[in-house]
Amino acid sequence: KLDGMRCICILSTKNPPVLKSRDGRIIEGLTHITDELSLIKADIILDGELYAHGLSFQNNMKLIKKYREGETENIKYNVYDSMSESEFMDRYLKACSIIKDCKHVQSVKTYAFHSEEEMKRYHSDNISLGYEGSIIRYGDIGYENDKRSKYLLKYKSFQDIAAIIIDILPSEADPKKGVPVLKYNNITFEAGTAFSHADRED
């Protein structure tokens, strides 16, 4: 599971490639990606994620939403599906075949597993490589557009603790908001969400 921006790419033999967000907004400023995609002569719609591995979600968004010379070029288009009525593996392999020569467009590795033990092993590998989690797909139906598919499941690992809230530190930027101070096993610490106030408003 990649913690970036969902991106739909419309490729056409007649028109330049178009990158769109999940809600249909045109994504601009990623010419290092669209220049490569323009060399592909195919009529296909790709589905994937704009993402630079190793960066936080917030830093990925900064580089995607506003061009920063020498930094935005680290963003890659990670393709994991294409839109058609074909079964998933056919869609995936077709997408992989047309982007195989690209530098900034790459396929997301996909594995088949046949037991819970195998699934957990692949998931553990994903976590150790610094990914957010895993996406589990089952079934062979065609691409489902404009809906959350019941055949796709997010799989994450969590560690839960029960800590006592002993204080809330007000924010200098917005006094109505703050950071909770927690206590667990005689250890006091602050807990945040890693989101800015602007991100939380969004």
Which residue stretches match the model-derived regions?
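Extracellular/periplasmic catalytic domains that process cell-envelope and extracellular macromolecules
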Residues: E71-T72, I127-S128, D174
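Intrinsic-disorder/low-complexity, polar/charged segments
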Residues: E87, H114-E116, S196
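Amphipathic alpha-helical
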Residues: T110-Q159
